[in-house]
């Protein structure tokens, strides 16, 4: 019996896939089809897959061509599969010609001509493109423009800004500049907002009233009542309003959450997060920049609060804020520390744009702890550590686009399906806003 094996993602299974499977089947007596897992696709940078693994497996099974279906989960697995399953022929489409010649040591390699004029990429690209307008004053706008190029069906549009010194040359082009916020709304299907936090409410409300979807850098608003109003407005109009915290979309960060919640370090007793950066800004000297410059609690607070609330929840019993201000009006904090007490745990965060500290994340448990080195908010590696160092484990994951790429993809999926693909839940977004509102109201605060 001649065994044949082939691999693919098989997203949105189409005639081209079926023809390739038919020709692969004709090469032997028994066809094994390897379907790539969601994780493996993501690790390879293939982020535009629209169907889940099980949907893709069932689509392949429904063709009746596969005698056996396996899941491809890691780089180098093809060699293991060929040896383990006693495969005689490996086959794949001719667009990969030469790529898999190294497998000739283990079996015969055949490259099959693909059916021209049809591909999953083309099918995905035929969907209406969502034009994403950019609002604000931040170099992150350049990253959004760059990362949007990796998301099929999303196109970076014009930008509206009070200061273009942050912008890349491509965004500085006159054709990319919106004359006004209204002009930007008219030219966009959706918006990414990173303007001054106190402007978010008005800008988002106008966007929703005009039927635009919104991805807004956290905090979405400065008051919880405003957040509830905007959420309800988006829901009533069947629009997407998503809180943007890129760290939530890092594969490594998401995996460490699962491990921690799964009890790998026992009961979680403490979460400590630090986020600092040195910003060249003097609010007493630069009045123009103060129109859009973020203070430390707004710039870093949502990121530092994220693991605390995702691991311990939002039901803390008390909190204490200690802060040091740069200006006499007490708007710009150079440094802020917040301590939380929960019924069975504690947490703390340190944020600052006028101090520098080790930007690590430590999650302490009754059996061990998880350590994420600086900068933890760009997580691609972390360690699970125990009393006996021999039991320690290290985890590595590829980080593409600092999480922004996957965040944009989730935003687009939410727009197209009407489902919630956000990795930041509504109750966490609301609690982030509440903590920042308490900061602005000087509640539970000590000024140092």
What would you call each of these model-derived segments?
Residues 228-246, 267-271:
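Rossmann-fold dehydrogenase core element
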Residues 299-378, 409-419:
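Contiguous beta-strand/loop segments that form the cofactor/metal-binding neighborhood of enzyme cores
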Residues 1-129:
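Nucleotidyltransferase catalytic core that binds NTPs
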Residues 129-173:
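N-terminal Rossmann-like dinucleotide-binding module
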Residues 248-319:
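Predominantly a Rossmann-like dinucleotide-binding segment in NAD(P)-dependent oxidoreductases
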């Amino acid at each position: 019996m001649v065994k044949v094996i082939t691999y693919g993602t098989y997203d949105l299974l189409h005639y081209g896939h079926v023809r390739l499977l038919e020709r692969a089947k004709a090469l032997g007596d028994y066809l094994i089809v390897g379907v790539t897992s969601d994780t493996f696709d993501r690790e390879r940078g293939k982020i535009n897959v629209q169907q889940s693994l099980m949907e893709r497996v069932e689509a392949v099974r429904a063709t009746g061509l596969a005698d056996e279906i396996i899941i491809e989960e890691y780089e180098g697995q093809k060699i293991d599969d060929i040896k383990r399953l006693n495969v005689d022929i490996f086959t794949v489409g001719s667009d990969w010609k030469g790529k898999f010649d190294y497998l000739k040591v283990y079996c015969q390699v055949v490259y099959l001509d693909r059916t021209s004029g049809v591909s999953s990429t083309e099918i995905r690209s035929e969907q209406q493109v969502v034009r994403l307008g950019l609002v604000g004053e931040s170099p992150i706008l350049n990253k959004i423009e760059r990362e949007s190029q990796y998301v099929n069906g999303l196109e970076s549009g014009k930008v509206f800004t009070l200061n273009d010194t942050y912008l890349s040359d491509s965004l500085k082009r006159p054709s990319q500049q919106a004359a006004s916020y209204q002009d930007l709304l008219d030219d966009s299907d959706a918006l990414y907002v990173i303007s001054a936090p106190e402007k978010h409410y008005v800008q988002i409300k106008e966007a929703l009233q005009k039927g635009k979807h919104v991805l807004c850098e956290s905090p979405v608003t400065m008051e919880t009542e405003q957040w509830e109003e905007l959420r309800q407005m988006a829901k009533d109009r069947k629009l997407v309003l998503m809180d943007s915290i890129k760290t939530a979309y890092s594969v490594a960060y998401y995996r460490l959450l699962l491990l921690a919640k799964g009890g790998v370090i026992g009961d979680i007793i403490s979460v400590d997060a630090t986020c600092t950066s040195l910003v060249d800004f003097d609010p007493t000297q630069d009045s123009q920049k103060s129109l859009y410059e973020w203070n430390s609690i707004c710039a870093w607070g949502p990121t530092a609060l994220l693991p605390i609330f995702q691991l311990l929840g939002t039901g803390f019993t008390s909190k204490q804020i200690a802060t040091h201000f740069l200006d006499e009006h007490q708007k710009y904090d150079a440094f802020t520390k917040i301590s939380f007490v929960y019924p069975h745990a504690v947490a703390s965060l340190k944020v600052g744009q006028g101090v520098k500290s080790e930007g690590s994340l430590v999650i302490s448990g009754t059996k061990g702890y998880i350590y994420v080195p600086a900068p933890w908010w760009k997580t691609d590696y972390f360690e699970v550590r125990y009393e006996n160092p021999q039991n320690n484990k290290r985890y590595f994951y590829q980080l593409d686009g600092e999480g922004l790429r996957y965040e944009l993809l989730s935003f687009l999926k939410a727009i197209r399906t009407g489902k919630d693909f956000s990795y930041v839940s509504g109750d966490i977004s609301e609690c982030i806003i509440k903590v920042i509102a308490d900061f602005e109201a000087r509640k539970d605060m000590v000024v140092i």
